[in-house]
Amino acid sequence: MRLHWNDLGAPRAEQACGKTVELSGFPLTVLPTGSADHFLMMAEPGCCQGCVPANRLAVIEVFADQPLRLGTGRLRLTGTWQVSPDPDGWRYQLRGAEVKPGVTRRALMAASPLFCLPAPAMAQAADGTAVDIHSHAGNLIPVSFGRGQFSAVAEPMRQGGVSTICLAIVADSPTIKLTGGRLRPSRDPRPGELYEWSRRAFEQLHALAREQGLPILRTSAELGAARASRPSLIVSSEGADFLEDRIERLDEAYQRWALRHLQLTHYRPNELGDIQTEPSVHDGLTPFGAEVIRRCNQMGVVVDVAHGTYDLVKKAAAVTTKPLVLSHTSLTGRPEPWTRRILPEHARAIAATGGVIGIWPVTAYFPNIVAYAEGFAKMAELVGIDHVGLGTDQLGLVGPSALPSYADLPQLAAALRGKFTADETAKLLGGNYRRVFQASLG
């Protein structure tokens, strides 16, 4: 028996209890994993563990006799359908679940453009000038917590033709955690806590740069000259929480840590404004947030409004005199609760400042390189070729990535060349951000 998602909550789903059924959906686990014997399945992909529908009729709880390989996209399952009487649990369960074998026509059609590309296109990266505008590469987040060691950054960048990455510390890390399936603020920070945390994280970032021979860029001229033969970093912070309402700390980060790219918010509504994944408390951007934007404009720091609400973005656009960046997201055509994706009007607000929107390779939305390239194409069609960039969130995604290594960038470049000219592809993979960096730093 084949079930469809619009059957849930209807008599057909109730009548299927005890029967063998088949259905397709997107898996969601509490923690990132390649296989599991217990997980949730949803009709639409979520960008992170936070994207769980509150409606108990909109999710299927899956139980398997052995771990199932989850893959990176839509999963076809068969099993015994059960209707749970537990009022506090999910209404529908799939027991004894197994993966339905076979290659779908859709998957084959999605991958087929790469089969037709000439060998030179597959082998050629952007041209050695690619820039990733949002990254946590090098195992930076775990190392900041004292876990593990740095992983290779420079060599994969050279292999893939990536000249520069905006390498970000995570300023609110000590105060966020996975709660109820969502990354959320877990407590208020202690006075001075996030400043001290960020200071140590900046130290780790600089240590990684020294260890792997990665120059830290401080001027637009340096970025203009950057090439993949000698990969480099731009110091970034995901969240301005380390400021703790003290504007002079922005000057300190600029001078001491070479901060040149600042994302205002992350996973806690902070002193600068509201975020997409929590209820609004500031009506968008705060007066302090506006002050930080003005100071960034004066000093020469790129302003990144990723994670901020649409109200925050509108107010930021009214304040800034320089282009805004929204470093990692993708386009959605409908409002979604707590999503990190953005609606067309949100994207247009960034483009209207002359800014750039980074497309991230979340496999729930883009299960392969060809689909990822289509994400670039859809955004470019909406806002124009000059306002789209590469924002991989390398080693920061809670799930798999369609671009797991910088060494894979030639595949993305080849897929983009199936949709864009060589010059347009170069803009998408770095040229547009280079323009914004130049405009911001002078």
Residue spans of the language-model regions?
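OB-fold and OB-like single-stranded nucleic-acid-recognition modules
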Residues: 1-107, 112, 122, 366-369
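Short, well-ordered secondary-structure micro-motifs
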Residues: 52, 316, 336-339, 369-370, ...
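N-terminal signal peptide c-region/cleavage motif recognized by signal peptidases
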Residues: 118-120
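Extended, charged catalytic domains and RNA/DNA-binding interfaces, predominantly
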Residues: 122-360, 364-366, 376-380, 387, ...
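Conserved active-site loop/cleft motifs that coordinate metal ions or position small ligands
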Residues: 166, 388-391, 426-429
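Short acidic/histidine-rich active-site segments
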Residues: 360-361, 383-403
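Outer-membrane beta-barrel pore domains
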Residues: 369, 397-399, 416-419
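Mid-to-C-terminal alpha-helical segments outside catalytic/metal-binding sites
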Residues: 404-442
